[in-house]
């Protein structure tokens, strides 16, 4: 993998785990797009532009205050594309525990992420304890 992309994606994932929106947004291109894991459209829900992307990212922590992305692996797909896999783990606002494998597809604009397209297994909440 391109060392720069690898460095960016590792730092990006760490910023997600740190719930550090400012660091995350510093890695996003000015013209950025985020496609959520679910939504009414074929691509999920599209959030276009820094303000909308930021708000959508922050909603992840609002909905899952202890959200974590574990066991990250990173892949260079060639050109301006890359991919990461991780295991999402978090507790929703009703106390439901969630854990599922996920994939993020990225498009880079230079050294910034211009597109984050998220996919996660559709798994019901699991029992706690």
Spans of model-derived segments:
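Short, low-complexity N-terminal intrinsically disordered segments enriched in polar/charged residues
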Residues: 1-30
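A beta-strand edge to alpha-helix "cap/lid" segment located at domain peripheries
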Residues: 1-4, 54-129
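Generic alpha-helical hydrophobic packing signal
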Residues: 8-15, 50, 54, 81-83
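Preference for short coil/turn "hinge" residues that link or interrupt alpha-helices
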Residues: 18-21, 40, 106, 112
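A solvent-exposed, acidic/Ser-Thr-rich amphipathic alpha-helical stretch
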Residues: 23-78
